[in-house]
Regions:
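N-terminal targeting signals for Sec/Tat export/insertion, comprising classic cleavable signal peptides
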Residues: 33-64
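Low-complexity, intrinsically disordered regions enriched in charged/polar residues
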Residues: 12-13, 17, 52, 123, ...
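Amphipathic repeat-derived elements
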Residues: 56-70, 160-172
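Bacterial Sec-dependent N-terminal signal peptides
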Residues: 1-32
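Feature captures C-terminal
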Residues: 26-40, 84, 88-91, 95-97, ...
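Short hydrophobic/aromatic-rich motifs at helix boundaries and adjacent loops
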Residues: 14, 62-67, 120-124
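Acidic/histidine-rich, surface-exposed loop or edge segments in extracytoplasmic proteins
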Residues: 64-80, 209-217
Length: 257
């Protein structure tokens, strides 16, 4: 909306005006008030019986779809810059996912903004993965020359860190400058080509990671099953089939000095 040439944002505001056409012109909005209501577990203490009855048949169906367990994690995993257990795990899963496509990426990048929830210790359900990765992002592989890889890491440093896979060790400054970076313990060779795993969203240069737009030999399968959340679920299922509890830790992939 615009008022007096200025944009006016109305958040969490619902206005219901029920007037007949004959009287509509007599009414003018005198004031609009808004408030935010935090929807959290405090509302569980006194559930509305009528609302619960209405939701029950739908909840049962949703729970049957989202409730199945795909794996287990050893401890709570959260996402935060410059490095986190959860972002580390997701990037390692992208590298792992390469085998499905006969790809061998040197490293992977997953944007922190694409991780929409944390994981709690114990069971991981389909619903947990959907909450964490709700977007229709597909796994993507591309090739970057070393000079563009360095440019990419500079852009990641400017953002204060993003999700990086195990091969990466980078040091950044508090004001977002890249101090150093290695891949598998070796300096990045500006003339060498590197295969990278990421999301198709990032491969388009989004989230200010424009170096990705220089990628060549881009492979981003668009089938539904190549959605990143299904790659994540498949990883958990494979670990569960092997009797493994999934672990991840902070190990200096991105350090601020």
């Amino acid at each position: 909306k615009k008022k007096n040439g200025m944009k006016v944002a109305l958040a969490s505001t619902v206005m219901l005006l029920m007037v007949s056409p004959a009287f509509a012109q007599k009414y003018k909005v005198a004031k609009v008030e808004r408030t935010r209501i935090l929807v959290d577990q405090k509302w569980d203490a006194q559930p509305d019986a009528e609302a619960a009855r209405f939701i029950a048949p739908y909840k049962s169906k949703v729970d049957s779809i989202m409730g199945p367990v795909v794996g287990h994690i050893a401890h709570d995993m959260t996402r935060h810059r410059p490095e986190s257990e959860l972002s580390n795990l997701l990037c390692d899963i992208l590298v792992w996912g390469g085998k499905q496509f006969e790809e061998q990426p040197v490293f992977a990048v997953y944007n922190m903004g694409g991780i929409r929830s944390n994981l709690a210790k114990g069971k991981v359900t389909i619903g947990d993965v959907n909450d964490m990765a709700p977007f229709e992002n597909k796994i993507c592989f591309l090739t970057l020359k070393g000079d563009k890889v360095l440019e990419l890491f500079q852009q990641i440093a400017h953002r204060g860190g993003e999700g990086l896979s195990h091969a990466v060790r980078m040091v950044i400054t508090k004001d977002g400058k890249l101090k150093s970076v290695t891949l598998n313990g070796e300096p990045v060779d500006p003339e060498k080509s590197y295969r990278v795993a990421t999301l198709d969203y990032l491969a388009e240069g989004n989230d200010q990671l424009v170096a990705f737009k220089s990628g060549t030999d881009v492979f981003a399968p668009k089938q539904k099953e190549n959605n990143v959340r299904y790659i994540i679920m498949n990883y958990f299922r494979e670990m569960q089939a092997q009797g493994k509890v999934v672990e991840s830790k902070i190990e200096g992939r991105c350090v601020v000095e």
